[in-house]
C-alpha cells in the first residue's frame, strides 16, 4: 500500500513538471512574454497627427552614443558674439522659453520620422549673447567631434529649435541628449546631436564632418 502511494506521488510530480514545461513552451511559442517597450509613455498622436516612434529615429553617430552628465555639461556660445557664454543644462531649460512643433527628419539613407520636438529657439539664444554684424554662419560642435554649419539667416528666419524633448520625453542618449538641432527642411546630417558648442562665424564655407567628406554644404531638401 505504501509503495502504491509513493508511486502515485511520483507520477503526479512527473505530470506536474510536464505540464509546467508545456505551459512555458506554449508561452514562448505564442509570444506571451511581450517585448519591453523602450519608450512606453511617448506621445504618438498630437493635434490629430500620427507621430513616428522615437525608436524609428536611427542612431547614426561617428563614435557611437555619447553619454553626457548634466552636472558637468556646458553649452558654450562663442565666436563672433558680444560675449562668450557657458550655459549649464538647467540654465538652458529655465532661462529660455520652451516651444513645441512637429518636424519630420529625412535621412540621406532613405528613412524618415515625424516627431514632436520640444526645445528652445536658436534665435533666443543668439539674442541673449548678442551677435556681431559680421557673422553670417553658425557652426555647431558635438562632444564626439562632429560639426556642421548652417546660415545664420536660415536659423533666424525659420524659428529653428534646439530640442531637449521628443514625443514628450527627454531625448535619450542614443538620440542626442542633452540637445539636438532640429534642422527642419535639411537632411539628417545637419541635425547635429550632443551639442556642446555653438560658434558664430563670418565664413559661409566652413565644412563640417560629412561636408568635408563630400556631402553638399547646402542640405536643403528639394
Language model regions located:
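N-terminal post-signal-peptidase region of extra-cytosolic proteins
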Residues: 56-63, 91, 108, 119
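Mid-length scaffold segments of soluble, non-membrane domains
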Residues: 97-150
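Stable alpha-helical elements in mature extracytoplasmic
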Residues: 73, 85-88, 118-121, 125, ...
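A glycine-rich, hydrophobic loop/mini-helix early in the fold
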Residues: 65-113
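Extended, aromatic/histidine-rich regions of cofactor-dependent oxidoreductases associated
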Residues: 2-75, 128-222
Amino acid at each position: 500500500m505504501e509503495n502504491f502511494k509513493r508511486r502515485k506521488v511520483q507520477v503526479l510530480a512527473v505530470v506536474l513538471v510536464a505540464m509546467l514545461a508545456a505551459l512555458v513552451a506554449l508561452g514562448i511559442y505564442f509570444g506571451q512574454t511581450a517585448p519591453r517597450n523602450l519608450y512606453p509613455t511617448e506621445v504618438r498622436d498630437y493635434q490629430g497627427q500620427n507621430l513616428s516612434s522615437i525608436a524609428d529615429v536611427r542612431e547614426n553617430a561617428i563614435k557611437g552614443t555619447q553619454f553626457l552628465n548634466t552636472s558637468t555639461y556646458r553649452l558654450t556660445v562663442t565666436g563672433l558674439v558680444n560675449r562668450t557664454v557657458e550655459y549649464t543644462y538647467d540654465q538652458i531649460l529655465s532661462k529660455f522659453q520652451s516651444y513645441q512643433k512637429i518636424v519630420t527628419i529625412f535621412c540621406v539613407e532613405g528613412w524618415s520620422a515625424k516627431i514632436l520636438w520640444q526645445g528652445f529657439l536658436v534665435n533666443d539664444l543668439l539674442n541673449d549673447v548678442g551677435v556681431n554684424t559680421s557673422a553670417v554662419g553658425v557652426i555647431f560642435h558635438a562632444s564626439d567631434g562632429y560639426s556642421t554649419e548652417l546660415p545664420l539667416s536660415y536659423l533666424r528666419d525659420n524659428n529653428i529649435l534646439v530640442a531637449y524633448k521628443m514625443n514628450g520625453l527627454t531625448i535619450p542618449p542614443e538620440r542626442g541628449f542633452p540637445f539636438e538641432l532640429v534642422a527642419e527642411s535639411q537632411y539628417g546630417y545637419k541635425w547635429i546631436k550632443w551639442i556642446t558648442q555653438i560658434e558664430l562665424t563670418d565664413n559661409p564655407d566652413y565644412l563640417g564632418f560629412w561636408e568635408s567628406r563630400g556631402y553638399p554644404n547646402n542640405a536643403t531638401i528639394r
